[in-house]
């Protein structure tokens, strides 16, 4: 096991070269050369579930897990790269896991939120605000039943000293205690939890961490318009690369270990 890893993280230059017209088609990708102390890096596994209620989303995710995530996890364990598991807190899956770090209370997590405004009725679209609610989906109970006993993927479980976090503040306090500055992300879904969780790429970038997305260790929630070319997935990764974050592929990380 080496003391550092050499990576060439990719980003998107919203710039043009000297002498070139300022138009979008003249912008493009670029790479940096980083030599990162191994002790300052962690792999964050976001919401790697055992299923999804949309069948093709589930199939893509399972293929990513089997072909990309599992080999990467094995390489990281062998190479000494820390792995942090971040399942969603909603079902208490993180909090009930024996590996949960338990560094923050739910009261602390909610402390900064204004509970009075917007009013609870407005948030819940009830009472005088009921007219603004989306219609009830006729198959929503069926959807809920399909994921009622959702769990962390059986092949992507914490081992040894690997920890589980439930909240962004958990992740931050743990990283602070370990001196971790670089967070490499994998998991699901690219355009949802990877972007929007408080332990996800955007919020942890706001806290000052360097963020690297593993672009072949994820897939997004596609629409009928984006499904064929996976433009939700690709667009979410490009969003990160355009706005201060980076990406690599799993084989690059494995080769660096």
Regions found by a protein language model. Name each.
Residues 46:
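Active-site flanking residues adjacent to catalytic metal/cofactor-binding acidic residues
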């Amino acid at each position: 096991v080496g003391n550092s890893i050499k990576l060439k993280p990719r980003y998107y230059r919203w710039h043009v070269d000297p002498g070139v017209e300022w138009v979008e088609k003249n912008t493009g990708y670029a790479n940096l050369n980083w030599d990162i102390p191994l002790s300052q890096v962690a792999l964050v596994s976001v919401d790697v579930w055992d299923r999804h209620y949309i069948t093709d989303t589930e199939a893509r995710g399972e293929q990513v897990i089997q072909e990309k995530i599992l080999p990467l996890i094995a390489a990281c364990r062998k190479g000494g790269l820390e792995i942090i598991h971040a399942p969603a807190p909603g079902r208490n899956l993180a909090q009930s896991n024996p590996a949960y770090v338990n560094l923050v209370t739910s009261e602390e997590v909610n402390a900064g939120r204004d509970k009075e405004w917007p009013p609870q009725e407005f948030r819940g679209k009830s009472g005088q605000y009921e007219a603004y609610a989306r219609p009830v989906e006729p198959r929503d109970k069926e959807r809920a039943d399909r994921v009622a006993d959702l769990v962390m993927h059986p092949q992507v479980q914490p081992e040894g000293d690997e920890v589980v976090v439930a909240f962004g503040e958990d992740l931050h306090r743990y990283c602070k205690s370990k001196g971790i500055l670089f967070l490499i992300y994998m998991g699901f879904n690219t355009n949802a939890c990877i972007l929007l969780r408080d332990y996800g790429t955007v919020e942890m970038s706001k806290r000052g961490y360097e963020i690297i997305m593993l672009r072949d260790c994820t897939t997004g929630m596609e629409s009928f318009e984006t499904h064929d070319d996976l433009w939700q997935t690709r667009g979410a990764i490009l969003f990160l690369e355009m706005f201060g974050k980076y990406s690599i592929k799993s084989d690059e990380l494995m080769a660096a270990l």
